[in-house]
Amino acid sequence: MPMRQLLLLRHAKSSWDDPALDDFDRPLAERGLKAAKLMGRELAARDWLPDQVLVSSALRTRDTWRLVAAELPAHPRVVFAEALYEASAADILSQIRKVDPSSGCLVVLGHNPGLEDLAKQLAGSGSEAKAHKRLEEKFPTAALARFVFDSEWSGLSVARLTHCLRPKDLG
């Protein structure tokens, strides 16, 4: 079975400027716009190119994906999933397990605390020590955790964390 890649990407920094806006409808802040583009360029440079993407349907996650996608050479299948908004780690994992079995590289673009909780839960033995330490320290906005594993999506429970990238480490 080929090696699969799972990329857990937290949405970029959002704006709290308009207190009247519902949380679901908050746009990206200026810093978030830059970070999303930076992470997109990093995915392209490392050749971590998704063939499928699950994106929370909140505005800040959709905007993050739009900016990331603009930096990629190809356009993967994208599913906007309301189930990823305010999702727990278990909710996110259940969405991942339903992914098309032919998919080799999946990006899940969502929110904390569920995304960070899932990343910590998935990181099994054989994970890179530096990446694990970063993940334990903080999983800020626009952070990316990359996992590899060689089972089916439907059976995912543990994987090898290879990288934990944060915009401040790249920019």
Locate predicted features.
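Active-site-proximal alpha-helix that buttresses catalytic centers in soluble enzyme cores
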Residues: 2-87, 124-128, 139, 171
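Residue-level preference for the first positions of well-ordered beta-strands
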Residues: 6, 105-107, 144
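Glycine-rich phosphate-binding loop signature in dinucleotide/nucleotide-binding domains
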Residues: 46-48, 98-104
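Hydrophobic packing residues within well-ordered alpha-helices of enzyme cores
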Residues: 64-68, 92, 118-119
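A glycine-rich beta-strand to alpha-helix segment
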Residues: 104-123
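Domain-level recognition of soluble alpha/beta enzyme cores
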Residues: 123-160
